[in-house]
């Protein structure tokens, strides 16, 4: 029995797709993750807490998506991207982004923004998240990539 949520993600129009691994795009997403961290810092220093929250989340999402690009998985649905990464790497690796995703949604769609001190803490967590994914993705071997591709491909077939 496979993972029902992942199987659902494979059926979505813009859901999970197996593609060729793309090291160039993976690196570009990591660069964008770091750029988004800088944007979040600027927004925070300008007291723009809403956009700081959004930039923090996107820095994490770009770092996470760099992993998926590196192993050849495409997805335009954030929940499915996070789910696939959690499935492949473990829930611990996606705990931070899952927490921050909710805060980004609250800020962007409901105008509920945390206090500045909490957003500063989120930014520190995001820096660790991006750094961890940078190290993780940079250290992937061809064998690792093939193992991840094999695991996710099995879910598509189940």
Regions picked out by a protein language model, each given a short descriptive name:
Residues 1-158:
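Terminal alpha-helical segments
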């Amino acid at each position: 029995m496979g993972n029902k949520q992942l199987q659902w993600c494979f059926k979505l129009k813009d859901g999970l797709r197996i593609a060729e691994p793309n090291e160039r795009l993976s690196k570009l997403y990591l660069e964008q993750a770091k750029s988004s961290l800088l944007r979040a810092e600027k927004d925070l220093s300008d007291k723009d807490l809403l956009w700081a929250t959004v930039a923090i989340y996107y820095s994490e999402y770009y770092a996470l998506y760099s992993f998926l690009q590196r192993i050849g998985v495409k997805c335009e649905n954030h929940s499915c991207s996070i789910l696939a990464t959690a499935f492949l790497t473990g829930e611990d690796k996606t705990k931070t982004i899952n927490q921050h995703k909710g805060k980004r949604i609250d800020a962007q769609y409901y105008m509920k923004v945390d206090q500045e001190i909490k957003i500063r803490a989120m930014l520190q967590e995001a820096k660790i998240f991006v750094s961890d994914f940078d190290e993780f993705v940079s250290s992937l071997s061809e064998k690792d990539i093939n193992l991840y591709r094999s695991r996710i491909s099995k879910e598509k077939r189940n």
